[in-house]
């Protein structure tokens, strides 16, 4: 990630134009079905992952799993936006500025914005821009948590790189983004394997003396 940041900072030093986020993308917001209807929320891996700020805090650059899922019935009933794979998402309430890429079709709660870019080549650039952005500039009160809303998010202006700048950035970093994604996925799988094997080892179900390395 530091290497990507270094390339970003070297390439994007000045811009010919600035545009609002809602000028370069369709900005949508998530939703929470009524908590009184517990049947909406599940932990079934076959249901649609529902991203919270807490989930973003536990994820890296890419979000692979969520603590809760929504049923398809709940999504349809309450018109919850389903966002596609590789969408950049941003938290803008309570904890402002957490970012991630989705890794499959997902939903989020109302504290998270999604950016469906008009130009998909801007995707990695937008992720970096929102990750490095100083959100304190947006605050009109002492509490940034209460100062940000969806209207402010949509009105954020960012520099628009030239085609040459953008192509250079994508050429230099696309393999790095893929590597980060693969590494994060492998780390999750290793953690899951550890959680399965460690109790068996502690209970004596696995004998290390019989394992060949």
Predicted features and spans:
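DNA target-recognition domains and sequence-specific DNA-contacting regions of bacterial/archaeal
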Residues: 22-161
